[in-house]
Regions:
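Long, low-complexity, charge-biased intrinsically disordered regions
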Residues: 1-214
Length: 214
């Protein structure tokens, strides 16, 4: 796809993908650049890039991988768009700030979640990213294991998952001799979820929430 038309977003805005429907025929392989390529091969290649340096592919890879068992033409078109995005942005890189004499190894994080984005199960997707020295050091995008009844609940579950990863990161930094100088800053754009975190009392709208353990 060297000569493909460039695109600058991994997926189409508000893209909604569904599993193979009755009467549809799955397409496990397709010819790209005169080569037979399997859908699983494309997902594996995208995942390899995402786990290494391309955090911007996390959501797209998570979504596309849900249809690996029986991909249809719609899933292929979405996957090829992600490849076009990767081709257009292949010069992007992570750059860590090492200009200071004493490098600050403290990290901070961001947590976000949508609500009921899975058309088949009504489950939400949450994600997080952690920054140190002005670049990302850890990231993830994952479908939640339970159905959230509101956007606040979805964000709250996402914060729980992110909080568990903070604890793991702090332990890791301790082991390499880079203990954090204070509490880890975690940012979220849902005010109701923030209030719930600050005052986690049982309420009628939240007492049913179960914690996700990673």
């Amino acid at each position: 796809m060297k000569d493909c038309k460039p695109t600058y977003t991994p997926l189409q805005h508000n893209l909604k993908l569904t599993p193979v429907q009755p009467g549809e025929t799955p397409i496990p392989e397709m010819t790209i650049d005169r080569k037979r390529v399997s859908y699983l091969t494309i997902i594996g290649s995208l995942m390899y890039a995402m786990l290494g340096t391309r955090l911007d592919l996390a959501f797209a890879v998570g979504l596309l991988s849900c249809f690996s068992a029986a991909p249809t033409s719609a899933h292929w078109e979405a996957a090829k768009r992600t490849l076009r995005y990767l081709q257009a942005t292949k010069d992007m890189e992570l750059v860590y700030d090492g200009s200071d004499v004493a490098i600050d190894m403290d990290f901070h994080g961001y947590s976000d979640a949508d609500w009921s984005s899975d058309l088949d199960t009504s489950r939400s997707t949450s994600g997080y990213i952690f920054i140190s020295n002005r670049a990302a050091i850890s990231w993830a995008s994952k479908r939640q294991s339970m159905v959230a009844l509101s956007s606040t609940e979805s964000e709250y579950i996402g914060l729980s998952i992110t909080g568990q990863h903070i604890q793991w990161l702090r332990t890791f930094f301790d082991e390499i001799g880079q203990s954090q100088s204070g509490p880890t800053e975690l940012n979220c754009n849902n005010q109701a979820a923030i209030i719930l975190c600050k005052d986690p009392q049982f309420r009628a709208r939240t007492k049913h929430i179960q914690w996700e353990r990673q």
